[in-house]
Amino acid sequence: MEHGDHNPHHGGVVYMYDDMHYEVVLDPGGHHRIYFTEAMREDLPAAVASTVTLTVERPRRSPETLSGVIDQQGESWTFDGQPAAAKDTSVRVAFVVKGSEYWIDVPFIVPAQ
């Protein structure tokens, strides 16, 4: 695969930070995941990042900040929050990698079925 491969492997949306890709899988039911891959899209262990949070911004409601936990397989960060409608909802994705804090605001995009 080329460095330019941004195809989701888990049904989410792929973004980049430095030479690392991360896939954000948002669920309207409130069960979210983030997966990390390296530049060539080989899987990285979830522990490559730390302090991983999602802040869900819904219309006319207070923001909901979710702290992630690494799943039992060590493959992804998982989050459990309140249900969210995609319309007019955004999510701040934040994490620390190699000692550097990073965040980005993204639209709430429901994964492809």
Name these PLM-found stretches.
Residues M1-Q113:
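Intrinsically disordered, low-complexity terminal tails/loops enriched in metal-binding residues
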